[in-house]
């Protein structure tokens, strides 16, 4: 368990102690295997490989033999010993009964290809397809094509490339197949065939970088290319100067016979070069000359954005958005552009103008999704102007129009705030009482209770007791499952049963055993989706996931069971405590609790943060690049590692180690808490969106924490603060003593 959580020093100590105390040869082998995996997690690949080779020499009959070969393959590949890596993966495939042989064969092929052993690579990739027909055949066939290419068997290589082109529906893969086929044709001296492949990509897949590579070859060889398509490919590749030149040539040669799209992409290209005046000029060419163009509405938005964000001309930006709405009041974009006009006015400090624009949304577009939010923000604008009667009127309208308990609670909060600001304490209390009852597990109801008690956000008794046993809680959970879902008494919920033979269970375990945790989690997610309506086997899966410490899919599985029982957020807390402890677990407590305490962060709050950030998955990575349990961005991590002067020899990959990630996260949150003078709300906002943004929002809101939340510019950060509050509320309910 210490290995999975990233507490590598402890893991090595435990494995070493187990090795020394082992009563059998098999136990010694398993302990040595754990030591090797620990070195691998440290990225000490040479030491890891030595450990696994020692295991092979001392315990050649061990049950972990096959997995040892796999781990050797992983280490040798990272050490650049590709021939040894390929051999190790092949040995795994030959000795393992595991269901992930397709992965081993694929990795063998990759290693052999890097070792220039092309025939072995071809055989390995073909074996991968035979082992699992559902595997990624596009990747495998492209790799086989590359191997034949390297063997100078270009005809066969092209056959593989074009088979991928014909079979896949993915544009990027098609562009890759075209590029490889075209390059092979060129090697054969068949230039016309090569150019046909490159041109096909330029015309059909302009977003693909491989299309840009093909375009570069066409241009270098003097092959004529449609200038608009040439500009488009350059634009998507980030080659904005060449894109502009191509669009200009296209427009010069087609002054009348073009649909205006070139102006849009030329404008974008100027924008990314920082040439804002030229960008606006191009957008206006499209706006005034081509009202039927696909990008016509987008051009208005781009123009307004440049005026507002880049040129600091908010009046013209507002006029642009309002001009669009005036010209095209029935356009799908009209409500959003009206909302943006209000947003620009608000950012410019013109709060009354913003309020009037936002109020107009509900009048003109009552069914638009953004209109209710616009109405609410109108109330916030009046409140910031100290026009409490106007704000109260808007919030009362929001209350009437609100369709969800959350919207009702939110409106009541601000009705109460208006009464409080006007000196009507009794009416304020009545509104907050109503808010507290509207949606008890929701942020605004939680905040209403704090207001009734005169508390700031994140003010709570920090005492806790994380002592619980899921094992002791299972009997109650299973009895509840049987009575709620009519599961027969003779159905054994405590064992996997037939689920043990499920291919996804086997793959999940196999991936876990060779430290491929992301792939194990992916298999778990696929399986829980397949079992979504199978309560009994979902529960069996849940217990397996807990055993493997795959907490993220375990939480989702438990939530699905609760949903199928017809329970909402509030009533779910009346289910057996087992399910609440799974969904809001004190996971990794040996790491998280002392680390949180070391940096003066309540473990209850830190658990809420980690649950929000990663759902307790140490190996998760966001699309933005954040990684690990506390979702740290690489640049933020490096800054804090430099301040901590720990860990030694830090690498971004260390963010997947729980001890490293949690330490950096707690240290950074503590820094932000100190920077913002103990204001946890601002510190959390800074953790999510950066201290500069948090400072700006504090300046707008003064000392009002409720206003702080509403003036946050990023919906993600607003949701972040609300979710952490909601999760913290449950952690307090469950663990506070």
Give the predicted meaning of each segment:
Residues 19-28, 56-67, 91-103, 127-138, ...:
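Short solvent-exposed coil/turn linkers within tandem alpha-helical repeat scaffolds
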Residues 6, 43, 80, 116, ...:
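Residue-level detector of the short coil/turn that links helix A to helix B
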Residues 334, 348-353, 357-358, 385-386, ...:
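Catalytic glycan-binding domains that act on GlcNAc-containing polysaccharides
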């Amino acid at each position: 368990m210490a290995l999975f959580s990233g507490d590598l020093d402890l893991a090595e100590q435990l494995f070493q102690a187990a090795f020394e105390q082992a009563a059998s040869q098999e136990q010694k082998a398993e302990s040595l295997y754990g030591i090797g995996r620990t070195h691998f997690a440290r990225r000490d690949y040479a030491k890891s490989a030595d450990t696994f080779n020692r295991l092979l020499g001392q315990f050649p009959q061990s049950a972990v033999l096959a997995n040892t070969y796999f781990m050797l393959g992983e280490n040798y590949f990272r050490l650049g010993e590709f021939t040894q890596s390929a051999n190790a993966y092949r040995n795994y495939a030959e000795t393992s009964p595991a269901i992930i042989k397709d992965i081993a064969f694929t990795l063998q092929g990759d290693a052999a290809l890097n070792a220039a052993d092309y025939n072995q690579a071809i055989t390995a990739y073909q074996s991968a397809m035979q082992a699992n027909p559902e595997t990624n055949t596009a990747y495998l066939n492209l790799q086989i094509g590359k191997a034949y290419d390297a063997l100078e068997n270009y005809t066969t290589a092209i056959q593989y490339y074009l088979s991928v082109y014909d079979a896949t529906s993915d544009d990027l893969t098609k562009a890759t197949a075209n590029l490889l086929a075209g390059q092979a044709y060129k090697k054969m001296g068949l230039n016309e065939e090569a150019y046909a492949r490159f041109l096909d990509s330029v015309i059909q897949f302009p977003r693909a970088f491989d299309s840009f590579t093909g375009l570069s070859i066409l241009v270098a060889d003097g092959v004529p290319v449609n200038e608009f398509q040439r500009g488009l490919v350059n634009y998507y590749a980030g080659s904005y100067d060449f894109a502009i030149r191509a669009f200009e040539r296209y427009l010069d040669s087609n002054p009348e016979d073009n649909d205006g799209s070139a102006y849009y992409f030329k404008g974008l290209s100027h924008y990314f070069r920082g040439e804002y005046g030229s960008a606006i000029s191009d957008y206006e060419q499209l706006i005034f000359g081509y009202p039927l163009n696909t990008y016509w509405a987008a051009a208005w938005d781009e123009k307004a954005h440049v005026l507002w964000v880049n040129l600091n001309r908010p009046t013209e930006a507002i006029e642009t958005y309002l001009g669009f709405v005036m010209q095209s009041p029935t356009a799908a974009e009209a409500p959003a552009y009206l909302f943006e006009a209000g947003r620009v006015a608000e950012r410019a400090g013109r709060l009354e103008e913003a309020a009037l624009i936002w109020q107009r949304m509900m009048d003109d577009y009552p069914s638009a999704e953004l209109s209710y939010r616009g109405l609410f923000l109108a109330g916030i604008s009046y409140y910031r102007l100290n026009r409490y009667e106007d704000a109260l009127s808007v919030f009362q309208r929001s209350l009437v129009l609100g369709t969800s308990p959350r919207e009702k609670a939110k409106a009541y909060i601000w009705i109460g705030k208006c009464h409080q600001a006007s000196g009507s304490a009794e009416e304020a209390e009545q509104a907050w009482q109503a808010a507290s009852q509207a949606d008890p597990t929701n942020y605004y109801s939680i905040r209403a209770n704090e207001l009734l008690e005169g508390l700031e956000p994140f003010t709570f008794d920090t005492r806790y007791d994380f002592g619980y046993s899921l094992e002791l809680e299972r009997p109650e959970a299973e009895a509840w499952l049987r009575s709620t879902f009519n599961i027969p008494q003779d159905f054994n919920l405590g064992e996997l049963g037939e689920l043990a033979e499920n291919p996804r269970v086997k793959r999940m375990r196999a991936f876990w055993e060779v430290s491929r945790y992301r792939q194990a989690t992916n298999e778990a997610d696929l399986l829980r989706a397949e079992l979504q309506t199978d309560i009994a086997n979902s529960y069996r899966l849940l217990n397996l996931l807990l055993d493997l410490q795959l907490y993220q899919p375990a939480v989702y599985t438990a939530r699905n069971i609760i949903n199928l029982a017809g329970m909402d957020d509030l009533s779910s807390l009346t289910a057996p405590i087992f399910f609440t402890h799974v969904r809001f677990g004190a996971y990794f407590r040996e790491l998280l609790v002392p680390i949180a305490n070391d940096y003066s962060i309540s473990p209850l709050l830190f658990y809420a943060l980690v649950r929000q950030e990663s759902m307790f998955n140490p190996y998760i990575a966001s699309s933005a690049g954040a990684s690990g349990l506390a979702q740290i961005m690489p640049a933020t991590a490096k800054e804090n590692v430099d301040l901590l002067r720990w860990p030694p020899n830090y690498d971004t990959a260390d963010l997947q180690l729980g001890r490293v990630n949690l330490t950096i996260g707690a240290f950074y949150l503590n820094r932000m808490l100190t920077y913002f003078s103990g204001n946890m709300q601002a510190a959390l906002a800074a953790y999510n969106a950066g201290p500069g943004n948090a400072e700006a929002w504090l300046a707008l809101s003064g000392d009002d924490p409720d206003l702080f939340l509403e003036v946050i510019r990023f919906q993600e950060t607003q949701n972040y603060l609300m979710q952490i509050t909601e999760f913290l509320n449950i952690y307090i309910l469950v663990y506070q003593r």
